[in-house]
Amino acid sequence: MRTARFSNPPGLCYVLRVPRPNAIQLGDEISIPILYEDRSVLVIDKPAGWMLVPYNWDKTGRNLQLALSSSILGGEFWARSRNLKFLKYVHRLDAETTGALLFSKSPGALKTYSEMFESRRMSKRYLAVVRGNPKRQEWTCDARLGPDPNLHGRHRTDAQGKDAETHFKVLEQKNGLALIEARPVTGRTHQIRLHLAHAGLPIVGDTMYGAPEDRTRKTALMGLRAIGLEYQDPFLRKRVKIEAPSKEFIEQFFLVS
C-alpha cells in the first residue's frame, strides 16, 4: 500500500492510500496475475509463450525473467509500489506451460527456496490433458531421463539418465482425452511431458513429445498447467499453500463435446 500526503487548503492534510496492483503489467497489453505474495516471495500465474531460460539468442524476445527485471529497473508502478529491487525465479516452467511460478525477492530468499526445491521440500501439482485412455486410475512413473544427443533442447527416457519420479491420477475422461493430476517428486527437464508420453498418453498440444497431429501445429495450446505449490515456510514458520485457478484451463479442452 502506497501513501501520498498533500495539503489543500493550508493546514488541512489528506492521506491518499493507493493499493498495490495485484498483477504485473508488462507494457500496455500484458497483465500477469499475482497469486500469492509475502515479504520473501511472489508467485505469478505464468502465461504461455514465455521462456525463463532461452536456449538460443533467437528466443530472447519472450524472456520472462528479462522482461520482469527490465520492468523493475524502469520503475514500473507494480514494482515501485512494492519497493522491489530484485526478483528471480526459483524454479522453472516450460515456455508453453502456464500456472504457478515462484519468484524470490532477495538473493537470500533465492538461496533458501532453491534449496527447498532441490531437497524436495516443495510439493507441486499440475493438471495435464492427454490423448488416449489411461490403463489405470493411479500410477507412478520412474523412467530415468536425459538429454537427446540428436536434438538440442529435447530430452528422452534414458536408462543411463537421471532419476525421475512422477505420481499420476486420472480425474476425468471424455472424447478420447483424459484430465490427469501430476505430482512430480523430482524436477527434471520436461519430466511430466516425457513420463506421460512414455505411458502412451501424450499431452495435447505438445509440439515436441506429442501425437503427430500436435507436432505439426506450432500454435496449439499445450495441455499442461501448474496448479499448486505447498511448503513449510522457513521465514513465516507456517504451512503455505498456493493454488492457481484451473476452471478456464479445463474448459478449453472439455467443453467441446
Specify the residue positions occupied by each region the protein language model found:
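RNA pseudouridine synthases
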Residues: 2-257
